[in-house]
């Protein structure tokens, strides 16, 4: 019988391994990306804000109440004049908002007609893509505690909210690909961003600590153990920091944890007082003073008795608090009734009313005592674990002594950096918090305005732009918060800078940051935390100061959406049979029964108690399967703390995993439908808290070794990477810094941007001839990154040739460049508009009498043309050519007209061909957008990199006849130095080149180089041998090398050359965009110092600073230094009066110079830099008298 069961078990395991094969899981992954997309976390959270959060904010906020007169339309009720109503008398009026409605974006034409506004037009007109928020205003009269409805004002505008593209409120929602093309949008534009003043803005997620969750930790080894909780109310946003501190003995201050005082006291730390409050006093206020109650709240283990007895003794001592000296901080905010009360009553009021605001206004003493008791229990358990660490370790190693009681008392310190204790605020949550702050001030502003007018007038509300301007300020500046507020976060709304490729924009949309300064010295927070695996990409983070602070979501990572705690509590209460309310528990019941009870927490708030916590977890899973609860609701049981935590708050990291038990039981999985797998329970979402209590297999190798251990499985191991790192071929065959470098450089790789021809960003770079990579990953294919490539497959030879490719230099084939290899076009947009505020500008062809010394021949000179005075399309413009002719007209007091030429001139960085001109208007002001195209051929100094982070700059461009060649005449496109491979250990580039060579030989268009393939996990070296063997079968050398001839003499090269296709990128760092020098004819000077200007924008040169000066002195070229820093800089001649030793009173006359101070003519001249002369004047202005002594005078 046992053998039969074992055989059945083995058979089931084999069937399971067959069911969850890599092929099936990749099929599931493909459907997930097609249905969910990569910006789901942005779109869903914003939709939740629009359809739920705005209504919640308005319902939770107090109504507008003021003394005044009714609106004029409310004087008649039910067709008759209301009895006793006097229109001249003021009444107590209340205005309530309901039926919130957010319209779709619209725009008003010049003839006042309204039509839909689309994103392309918003970009073109440089306006914000936003929509109106309307409410119905109910007007009540408060009389004798009765609310009398006297009027109802429909569709009153209260704000304009920026709308996220492709969200449910966007006009592009549910549009077909063809319709989006007709509306000027790209087919693959994912949305998830905003358009503010014509610029695209992305809200960057903000990582923070979780609210309403206690964390026990020790800051430093010598500091006391603390248990912190930031309690925040869902309704009001009011928060309080509750901190419990275990007072260690003086021995513990010497960093000897094994000798901690076992009778240490516990204090409550709050911001309202600087002096700690004994926990015994807090329990006394909460009417917990007996040992039985404390055992029920904290625990009945013998190890905790000494602490409980001490608390009871202190609680029964009435003078323990009276003898303390309480210092209330200046930030105290108690009401007027308690200002004359004693300090003891103030603390008592805080404990009874303000402590744990997330429990609600109606929370009882019992609920607060339970929550406080659980925090005390956690604190004591961690303390006992620290004291008895060796004993617990010894018991853990001894199988015979491993008892349940030992496990119950073992609880280590918690990690604040653990992702189960973190929340990320995405677009919807950020808008929710900002709108709530603005709405509170909006209500106060309306009350003030209505009281001034002394009447209900809807234009006061509809014309109040407080919310609109506040939202516009935050979105346009990136400073998130209400102006003149202490708490404003910077850099939340950002303009995507690296929009040079398709994948780089997705990376921006999936970014989140830790809001701390880049100069922060905390290195631990920058390190990769084990709990972040499959949530945050371990490779995609910038180098330098922002390392570990700017992060990106992994491929399957999502963010939970808030579900009200009240709804969750009602469902749990109705569905769980062992549920008990707090008030139903009596201490007279069986103590054994009480010891089995576990507290149910919903988002940190107390829901009830249960004697069957495991059954509750099962009930929650069934409710999720029946769609009674959302898929992102999580439930975990912590036996050491006797707590069940059900989480439905927003911002939790969640991801889908395979439910092995469901797959075993049901089978017949539809792997091509992610939604079907989710509905049938084959796929479940888990957050970081649930994952800590789960056994998840990463691949089939883990599952086959321990099939009975794992309850879940990852969909694919490569999903631990982010958008950019997941595109790197064979990412597991290179060192981790290379993945980080490539994730950053791939964002700078110039590619083909969707719909770039209809957008007019400030600078857009597009590669002319892009190619799909021969070797790529499954994730890149599934998300269609290869449909918009950012490089090409170059034939690369790895060899030392001429010496010009040393130190990461690259030799390029000139003939390949002539055929279009790596050609890039840079589009620069110049915006010119007619200014009407303060000046009177007009775009036209300036008359000859007012023109400057510029070229006006390229302008349209037909007055009937709508482009009169604007440069013609397809014209080649260069420096000092006029792009747009503009004239400023001023009328003097005597009536004469004076015209001044104010035309827009081409600068040195804007030379090129006029690609297109867009004529539009913004708020009635004429505007032209001129797009100039610049052709960028590869040249010496330009930067390139492979898809495996082998970067380099062009060191030489060789003629094709000088390049090495093979026997069949094949010539490489580029030559790289072989020393770059062993030093950087980029084995994946060698593998990708071999696979690409095989693909070319077999006429295959796709070589699968996905990381962590099942076939290469057991023995990675077998994968390399298999690639080489396959190449050999195609007729090439096993190791990928080729015999090549020298390009100069045709002789055979001694060494065989590794030769094959490698996917290469051209980066945005180009010499033509950075090189600059100052012309000798440039006479531009600084207005104050009279020194030449430096910098490319000022047409200046490199500034000679202090260090440059020292280097030139070392080289012995002091004459050159004198010439550059004096003769050609700010040379100045000073006339000095020798007797007065000053030059301030020397004046020039017809007969020469004389001193007006002493009437003398003993004047000498000396050379001096004008900056020094300016310094002398500043010293004189500060009251310092300067005297100049002349030698031999």
Swiss-Prot record:
SUPFAM superfamilies: beta and beta-prime subunits of DNA dependent RNA-polymerase. A zinc finger (C4-type) spans 1137-1158. Its EC number is 2.7.7.6. InterPro entries: DNA-dir_RNA_pol_su2, DNA-dir_RNAP_su2_dom, DNA-dir_RNAP_su2_hyb_sf, RNA_pol_bsu_protrusion, RNA_pol_Rpb2_2_sf, RNA_pol_Rpb2_3, RNA_pol_Rpb2_4, RNA_pol_Rpb2_7. GO terms for molecular function: DNA binding; DNA-directed RNA polymerase activity; ribonucleoside binding; zinc ion binding. GO terms for cellular component: DNA-directed RNA polymerase complex. Signal peptide: none annotated. This is Probable DNA-directed RNA polymerase II subunit RPB2 homolog. It comes from the Viruses. Component of the DNA-dependent RNA polymerase that catalyzes the transcription of DNA into RNA using the four ribonucleoside triphosphates as substrates. Second largest component of RNA polymerase II which synthesizes mRNA precursors and many functional non-coding RNAs. Proposed to contribute to the polymerase catalytic activity and forms the polymerase active center together with the largest subunit.
